[in-house]
UniProtKB/Swiss-Prot annotation:
It comes from the Bacteria. It comes from Microcystis aeruginosa (strain NIES-843 / IAM M-2473). One of its GO terms (molecular function) is 5S rRNA binding. Keywords: Ribonucleoprotein, Ribosomal protein, RNA-binding, rRNA-binding. Pfam families: Ribosomal_L25p, Ribosomal_TL5_C. SUPFAM superfamilies: Ribosomal protein L25-like. The keyword Ribosomal protein applies. GO terms for cellular component: cytosolic large ribosomal subunit. This is Large ribosomal subunit protein bL25. This is one of the proteins that binds to the 5S RNA in the ribosome where it forms part of the central protuberance. HAMAP family: Ribosomal_bL25_CTC. Belongs to the bacterial ribosomal protein bL25 family. CTC subfamily.
Amino acid sequence: MQVSVECQKRPENINPRALRRQGLIPAVLYGHNGTESISLVVGEKAALTLLKKASVNNTLVDVNVPEMPWTGKALIQEVQSHPWKRNLYHLSFFSVSAHGKLDIVVPIKAIGEAIGTKQGGLIEQFVNEVNVSCIADNIPEVIEFDVSEIGVGQSLLVGDLKMPEGVTLKDDPHTTVFAIVAAKR
């Protein structure tokens, strides 16, 4: 899925609150030229649309800044929002090289219906995401785990996950991800 966002360089000496009142969300792009960072603004509608399509530290985003010669891909590194109003406050992007290795977090999704649940057991998920290493062009959105063969009293470990090609697991392979426990009567 191709996701992109249009940004502008942030005007100097303007309060972030004033920008938000104008419908602009302050943002920053890290790592586009070594250690240099650049202050940006994103339209609020564009930012909200972006966040519906992309997830933090998982989706590559084409960041376009017309005032800069740099164009490239970035990960959304951080999203700041008001704790209860849910208003968007700030976005942080981290520039990535298409062929450079990244350490990222990927969610785990169970597929299938476990044999143990058909026998009256309950499935418990202990780990919701795993740390992996891969190149930027090969980031999986989710890692699916087939639980259909698990019976009551059995479990699946992180080491049992089937990683997509080019993706390396960074977590302890002996950590339990799913287990089927007998239901209390």
